[in-house]
Amino acid sequence: FKGNYTGDGTEKTGVYFRHLLPETAGGSHPSFLIANTETLIPGTSTFFGSTAPPNAADHKVVFAGFDDELAPTLGGIYLAPLAPTPALTTLVSIGQRVPGDRTKAGFNALGEGIAFDGRFVGFWGAWGEESREIKLYCPAEGNRDRIAYCNKELLCEGADEPIGDPGSICDETGCFQLRDVPVNQGIFVHDTRTQRTHVLAKTGDEFDDFLFWNYAGKAPCTGTGPLG
């Protein structure tokens, strides 16, 4: 699992595991660290700036971690045994050549949601500088503070006037934000035995996108999550 916490006044995040027993609350086994923001990105002298929720199978775990979650220049997808502070094996990395791409481009974005069955790792990846603009309409369901902030209707305690996300645009259709998303993206599978990465599908004539983009802005004066 992924855990967020604050240490010495600094926000931190990490990937952990815990052995569960058929008892109340899963037993009393402690949780163990796999990697966190005090772990060096393999092959670099840079610490992880973010880690994503892991996926575990066959006593192994895979997860994505980057130096910068929003604009990664280092990091990738990693494999590790379910053991305390294990050695990490790099499966796919930022900058690695995209399989099957004639331009020899490298990945500049990798998805946090990863499928894993103990051998094969499925993931989303993007590359290139080309982008297209989409509208992200403010959510109608979910956290009420986040909804209010997106719609410029959030009233903080002690304030006289409501505030809103400066990135929101409101018209007769409602409030929304404009987001640039990558044109070049695809779904890939990495074989941990052969160490080869294969393409399943790419954007082009048949597909425009492989992700559902949504607004997840952090609302100030509340305890909601980070911008995503």
Features from the language model and the residues they span:
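Conserved "turn/edge" positions that cap or connect secondary-structure elements
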Residues: 1-228
